[in-house]
Amino acid sequence: MTKSELIEQLCSKKPQLSAKQVEDTVKEILEQMATTLEGGDRIEIRGFGSFSLHYREPRLGRNPKTGDKVELDGKFVPHFKPGKELRERVNYS
């Protein structure tokens, strides 16, 4: 599902809200989540899951074009851990 598909689906479920209101709300939620992760904080949505940052250690990589070894810096990557309710819903639906 894309962001625009999510907005369309929410609009059909909540016809009292304008498409612009739904779009602005979805964008604001995603922006707040990105800002929270950017600040190094964790996001927990009970029953759904949690978002956090995992650190990837610096490592030696390889350039696929040339085969040369390349030094890759350490970095933080977003990580999602599904909650119990979401896992059960996906596995038993």
Curated annotation (Swiss-Prot):
Keyword presence, DNA-binding: yes
SUPFAM superfamilies noted in UniProt: IHF-like DNA-binding proteins
Alphabetical keyword list: DNA recombination, DNA-binding, Transcription, Transcription regulation, Translation regulation
Single Gene Ontology BP annotation: regulation of translation
Function: This protein is one of the two subunits of integration host factor, a specific DNA-binding protein that functions in genetic recombination as well as in transcriptional and translational control.
Species of provenance: Aliivibrio fischeri (strain ATCC 700601 / ES114) (Vibrio fischeri)
Subunit and partners: Heterodimer of an alpha and a beta chain.
Entry-linked InterPro entries: Hist_DNA-bd, Histone-like_DNA-bd_CS, IHF-like_DNA-bd_dom_sf, IHF_beta
Alphabetized GO MF terms: DNA binding; structural constituent of chromatin
Signal peptide stretch: none
HAMAP family found in the cross-reference section: IHF_beta (MF_00381)
One Gene Ontology cellular component annotation held by this UniProt entry: chromosome
PANTHER family: DNA-BINDING PROTEIN HU, INTEGRATION HOST FACTOR SUBUNIT BETA
Membership in a protein family: Belongs to the bacterial histone-like protein family.
Alphabetized Pfam families for the sequence: Bac_DNA_binding
Protein name from the UniProt record: Integration host factor subunit beta
